[in-house]
Amino acid sequence: MNKKTPKKHSTLSNTLFALKWQFEIAPGYTVFTLMQTVLGDVVTLFEHTFLTAYIINCVEQKKTLTDVLYFLIPVAIAVFIKLMLNTFFDAYIAPGEREKIQMKTRMRLYEKAASLELARYDDSGFYNDFVWAMQKAPDHITGAVGAFNTLLSRITVSIIAGAYIVSVDASSLLILVFLMPFTYFSGRAINKRAMKMQEEIVPVQRRSDYVSRIFYLADYVKDLKTGNISPKLEKDLSDSTEEMRAIVKKRQKPIIALNVATNSAAGLIISGVYLSYLFFKALVLGKFGLGSLLGVYNSTQTLNGKVLTAVSNLSEFQNHSLYIEKLRRFSETENTMEDNGRLALPAGGDIVLRNVEFTYPGNSEPTLKDVSCSFKRGEKVALVGFNGAGKSTLIKLLLRLYDPTGGKISYGGENIKNYRIADYRGCFGVLFQDYELIATDLARNISADNKPLDIKKADEALKKSAFWEKFKTLPNGYETQLTKEFDESGFNPSGGEKQKIALARVLYADSDIIILDEPSGALDPIAEYTLNKTVTELSSDKTVIIISHRLSTTRFADKIYMLANGEIIESGTHEKLIKQNGKYAEMFRLQAEKYR
């Protein structure tokens, strides 16, 4: 797979992407929050600035109460409506809508992840984007939309405040023309330094977060308790904290200095020079009343504050954009594995590999070389070999998790690419070496879907997987919760018990082709014997493929393929390979020595 440098989108483009994403999920919520933010700030401007100025002017001009109420009542109604709508919306509507955005965003990502070929997960860049998108995307989608709403609100309020200033005293524009660029560029300088500080903190924070996870994740508990690595990890955590403090101390000083200088200069200009100018025009020249003076002064303060916070908001947009960029890269990733097969899948068929080669993406050396073999319907076939021989890779190719880089795999006489991937994979029941059980009830772990459990089939699967005796001791039967993740009374199966449940899942599926990757790895001798008996007793139309290092499991196979360095070096029955006295026989004798 050729890796292309992904196109990087602008902050504006990523913000619009977030808006579109959220609007598709919750259009009403998206529109209302925009109106709530913009109109809410406009109402606040009228309430705190224009209404006060109007009332003072009315008093100064000795106008009637009716004149005051003419403006006061509409503003009061607007404030009341704003408060009522905000209270109702924030308490009853927003929580559910935010949860919907979170849930549907994750569902989109889950569906995208499920549609992509396994090779994508070998790409560390892709996997990193996937993890970040899963963890951070929902918050940064809503965060970017919120930042956009706030920016639009600030622009709207600034335009209204500016228009009011010009309507009262057009010459104030000279002050604003000087003040606004000063505020803008000062804000940019502060923002640039804040972003630099954040960029330096992020990698240190990630190291700190990683060490923290080691201390609270159950996966590491046994190693922490039996080893002596805790002091080292605690030192790493302390060092990370000190490093972040040093970065903040170093970078915060110029930020504080710029903030103080900006606020002091703006305060001197607005509260000193500009306010004196307004008093001169109002009291000496009589150009406008005290109410208008207060309105213009407050509008100028508002305008200056909105410009400064709008500039500081740029860092917020950039921060959201970093995560949305990862979300976009992930969501726009195309599946390079073709899935345009149209042939109907036969009820059963042989699998044949001809001169199959495979090289993992990013590797130069092939993992499989010129592999030719067959798995006939009803056969029990074993794949054996030392670690790294290519056995698990061969299984991934059979399942079409990867496509061969050379040669062909056929099923029922047709290239497997001629079938729909979902139909083809539906033929298989697989117990992977790194299988997982889900923190839900036993029934769902066996059925692996939402259909009602067939109790008779499930009972038979548990008996064949040697879990039946343990199952009879579980008070809640198939409703037993596995693990204590969500239920304190849940059942925590041992390693061997987990493997038996996972095997029962495969047997319950009753697939035409069963693949067992190290099925006896965690089983005791009695359970291993039961497994061997189960495999040999499976109906004659079931193809069973077993990968195992324990040759006591594979000796009952109809055919054995011995792999080494990505090639099949021996094949035949157990008896035939023993007589050949090759690598298989050598491996078998080495294992047999342990039991003498």
What positions do the PLM features span?
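ABC-fold ATPase nucleotide-binding domain signature/coupling loops
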Residues: F130, P366, W468-I501, D510, ...
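ABC ATPase nucleotide-binding domain helical subdomain, centered on the C-loop/LSGGQ "ABC signature"
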Residues: K408-S410, R425, A443-E488, N532, ...
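An intracellular "coupling" helix at the cytosolic face of ABC transporter transmembrane type-1 domains
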Residues: E24, W132-A144, K196-P203, R213-Y216, ...
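Membrane-integrated ABC transporters
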Residues: M1-T44, E60, L65-Y70, D90-A94, ...
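C-terminal portion of ABC ATPase nucleotide-binding domains
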Residues: G477, K533, R550-R596
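Cytosolic ends of transmembrane helices, especially the final helix of ABC transmembrane type-1 domains
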Residues: I229, L293-E332
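A hydrophobic transmembrane-helix motif
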Residues: V43-Y54, N149-N191, A246-Y297
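Helix-to-loop junction immediately C-terminal to a conserved catalytic motif
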Residues: L398-L399
